[in-house]
Amino acid sequence: MGRRWVLAIAGSVLLIGSCAEEQPEYLAVDYESWERTVASDLTEIVPGHGGGLRRIYINSIGTDAVLDDDGAIRYPDGTIIIKEAHTVTDSSDLEAPAALLGMVKAPGAEDARGGWIWVYRHVDDGTEEIFAEEYCITCHANANESHPYGEGNPRGAFRDFVFYPY
């Protein structure tokens, strides 16, 4: 009787575990076919992204961003922005990225901060981690005012948390 009980519990655990909802994969594998938000490679040091070269890609939904008369930019739901972070600063030495960082516009999502889900893909195994705390949004809020990166948003317009808008 004891062995049957153990087998029944083990079977139930396996059945319940197999029904668990998997976390969706947010960052597309084919992102390199997307448009880049900035044509050039970015090499200036940006806190939180390492000191190497960066390339930023945006999906086709994001290319329909709305630019208001006051310079504000709003990205449509479903926009995905992926930043490759490299360890080198010279594109002639470029290899696979050290990290992939992403923003997914999903204002209604439980894990969204500022209307975006902030994602880190581990390049070694392809798993993704959602930053549900305030780490990313705290820095990216600065994109909505004048800042020292790129063209600097001199008018301090709302940029939907994106430093290098499309």
Predicted ranges, named:
Residues 1-9:
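Bacterial N-terminal signal peptides that target proteins for export
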Residues 2-3, 54, 158:
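Short, intrinsically disordered low-complexity segments
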Residues 15-18:
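C-terminal motif of bacterial Sec signal peptides marking the signal peptidase cleavage site
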Residues 20-31, 71-166:
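Sequence context surrounding c-type heme c attachment/ligation sites in exported
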Residues 26-74:
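N-terminal secretory signal peptides
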